[in-house]
Amino acid sequence: MSRVRLAVKQAPSLRVDLRGLTPSAMAGLAAAQIERLHVTHGTQTIALAELFTVACDGTPEADSELLFEGDLSRFDRIGWQLAGGRIVVAGPAGDYVGACMTAGEVQVQGSAGLLAACEMAGGTLSIDGDVGDHAASTLPGSMDGMRGGTLIVRGRAGDRFGDRMRRGTALVFGDVGDFPASRLVAGTIAIGGRAGAHVGYGMRRGSVVFAGGAPSLAPTVAPTFVPALADAAVAWQLIARDLARVAGSDNGPFAGLGARRTVRYLGDLSADGRGELIVAV
């Protein structure tokens, strides 16, 4: 597999929009041609050569690996609408990373900004650090959040994680902010740390798993959720097995979930009442 390497020369003075920079867009281009591609810097467009040092290992193909090196915390929309191939960010990333992607893989070897994986429909987004508010949620003004694929956050997540999420699997190894899984339509969210206020506010369906285990990490359950009386042991074994698989070899709080007892709550009764909060104890 060929590789395109983009190393940041220096931090930009304004935010940079990297939408359109995907392995398929660079297929068949030489390094000199990639340097002449334009991106938005603030309100103007500039050539990539002004921001990055470009190097190619072979001729780029549609499934090539695109490697960003350096501090990309001011570079937004990395992996926007990605439909295949692999993108690696060797450092922090900006806002909208992995947004609207439908296939492929994005790996961030650091933290990411706001709205990561929003309206994601497929593929895998892995973030080794923390992620900002509204991850796996909707784009501003939209009604549907994450629609498929897998999001893995090995650090902490901000507020409104999974807001209006409709499908897919989202894991957070650490703590999450307020309103996690708010207005959840469907899909699975798993949290390894402590959750903020208003867990599952307005959720209609879907599953939210709390894998922390310690009593101090148990969520505060709103009165619009009620204890589940029916046994769901078989379903829990399937969920636990899938979460361990998605989390990978270093599955941390998601290891051995199937052997733990669970307490389930159904709700949000003020919305539709068919979602579930699963607390592993």
Feature annotation, model-predicted:
Residues 1-67, 71, 77, 128, ...:
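Intrinsically disordered, low-complexity terminal regions
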Residues 132-142:
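Extracellular beta-strand/beta-solenoid scaffold signature
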Residues 69-71, 90, 99-102, 109-111, ...:
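Feature marks extracellular polysaccharide-active and adherence modules
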Residues 48, 63-79, 83-102, 107-113, ...:
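Surface-facing alpha-helical segments and adjacent helix-coil boundary elements at the starts of domains
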Residues 118, 136-138, 219-221:
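Short, charged, surface-exposed secondary-structure boundary motifs
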